[in-house]
């Protein structure tokens, strides 16, 4: 059976408190979307890894579990605070999942942040970029979603990430961002089921939301 691994890396730093409610709702909607995809495409096993991070922790809420084994997250699961060790979160997340997958597996990595790297200790930009470039040669697709106060295109380019989207850091913008991401996730899986690879740089094409 074909497997699709959904790695979702979400910033839990203090500044995310502005959109805490919408972020939590959006994460739950994403989990439900993956479950719906599993139902629509039973020939592809959907697995979920959900990682949140700030300067005090890198936490796996889900660690490579079946989509149907996920549950609705509560406010206890997402409590913004601290700084933004973005490189550590990405490096730790993709390195762990890489050890759990085979080269033929399909992996969709979604990175959501409202801030730039400022306190990583284990990984630097070069290390993360090299990891991403290596995994892109397999069936890994990387997406970066950031608030529009950031240079999202520049951040994505520095990490060798082809697909990126910016969104306003407010309730409406956050809600629409998750909607756009979920539509794109469904499209990605439909193309996989049909044996058509998603072209790099086209993940968010024609989806609601602001594409850089």
Q: Language-model segments: what does each one mean?
A:
Residues 1-212:
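Acidic, low-complexity intrinsically disordered regions
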């Amino acid at each position: 059976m074909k497997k699709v691994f959904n790695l979702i890396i979400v910033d839990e730093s203090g500044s995310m408190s502005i959109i805490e409610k919408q972020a939590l709702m959006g994460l739950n909607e994403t989990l439900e979307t993956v479950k719906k995809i599993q139902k629509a495409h039973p020939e592809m096993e959907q697995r979920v890894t959900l990682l949140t991070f700030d300067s005090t922790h890198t936490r796996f809420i889900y660690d490579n579990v079946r989509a149907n084994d996920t549950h609705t997250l509560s406010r206890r699961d997402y409590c913004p605070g601290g700084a933004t060790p973005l490189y550590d979160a990405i490096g730790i997340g993709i390195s762990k999942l890489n050890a759990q997958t085979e080269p033929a597996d399909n992996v969709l990595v979604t990175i959501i942040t409202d801030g730039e790297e400022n306190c990583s200790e284990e990984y630097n930009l070069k290390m993360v970029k090299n990891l991403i470039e290596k995994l892109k040669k397999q069936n890994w697709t990387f997406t970066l979603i950031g608030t529009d106060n950031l240079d999202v295109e520049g951040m994505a380019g520095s990490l060798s990430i082809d697909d990126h989207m910016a969104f306003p850091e407010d309730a409406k913008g956050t809600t629409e961002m998750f909607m756009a991401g979920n539509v794109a996730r469904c499209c990605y899986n439909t193309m996989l089921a049909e044996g058509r690879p998603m072209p790099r740089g086209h993940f968010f094409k024609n989806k609601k939301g602001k594409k850089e």
